[in-house]
Amino acid sequence: MTRRVVGFTLVEVLVAMVIMAIMAVMAWQGVDGIVRTRDATQARLEQTLRLNTVIAQWDQDLASIQDSNAVPQALACDGASVRMVRRTPEGLQIVAWSFRPDDSGGAWVRWAGPAVTSIGDLQDSWLRSLQLQGGEQGSLKTLTGMTGWQVYFYQTNGWANCQSTGNKVAQTGSGGQPAPRIAPPAGVRVVLSFAPGSGLNGDLTRDTLLGP
């Protein structure tokens, strides 16, 4: 008696292949989703770390402000830039933070002049900070994807736009000498606005207390 050979029919094989193909696609989509989530999380983490580093530098600059009596103000704001005199181990240094348009929409740029030890060099560096265009040596794009920023000074028991508090950038006096200085405010508030898709959507507000 001949034994009957048992096996899969062609239809069963095709059905099995279709099922395996569907499972493979689902598995790939799952892996792809995990990879995309990981990449997005990593990018977000890097952006957050960079933001924290930049804000820490901003705070450090403000904490190091030194009233030198050699320039109009230890801290000045003209709307486009915030300039300050900060102390370093090598001497005094002029630092300027500015908002500059770029391909991402806008960037927060930090310029740092050389540390100097003479009044003349400090005044020259201050005057140079009034003419920055954004690409000078010492300039660094700290954050990108921005749409704008606002700066407020705390004086007379309240916050006000830095240009309306009396801490405007002073004009130079006769002979190119800086005009009398203006005392810094008690605190500084910066509001950074980020564009959609930048990874840091919305506004970030940071308040920094000055002085002892």
Where do the PLM segments sit?
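Residues embedded in well-ordered secondary-structure elements
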Residues: 73, 86, 135, 179-181
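Short linear sequence signals and composition-biased patches located at protein termini or domain-edge surfaces
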Residues: 143-212
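Solvent-exposed loop and beta-edge segments used for protein-protein assembly and interaction
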Residues: 76-78, 89-91, 182-184, 200
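Type IV pilin-like appendage domain
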Residues: 79-164
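A short, compositionally biased
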Residues: 77, 102-106, 183-190
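Aliphatic-rich helix starts adjacent to a transmembrane/signal segment
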Residues: 2-64
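Short, glycine/small-hydrophobic-rich surface segments
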Residues: 62-86
